Amino acid sequence: MLTQRPTLSDIRDARVRTESIVIKTPILTSEYFNDLLGMELFFKCENFQKTGSFKIRGASNAVFSLTDEEAKQGVACQSSGNHGGAIACAAYLKGIHADIVMAKSVSKAKIH
């Protein structure tokens, strides 16, 4: 758990840990919406990530930050969808166990 703000070094370390997992997604704009709203909008397309959301960024950084001893214990999270999928994906890629707890009311589309 973070007790202080991440440093530039922390951010660089996270990039190294996740560069083989996280996809460099495009930033797009829309002439239609720009004209409609009278301003230039930019859309970061994180939906192109392996798990369909930006959540893989933090999940893979957290999972790949674990020590060997911590990784042996596996990981767990509670989620309504995207975070759970990202933790499960990162754990799979690291070769460790993951328990994902989801409410019964979660949309079936969110369960991979």
Per-region residue spans from a language model:
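PLP-dependent amino-acid enzyme catalytic core
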Residues: 1-112
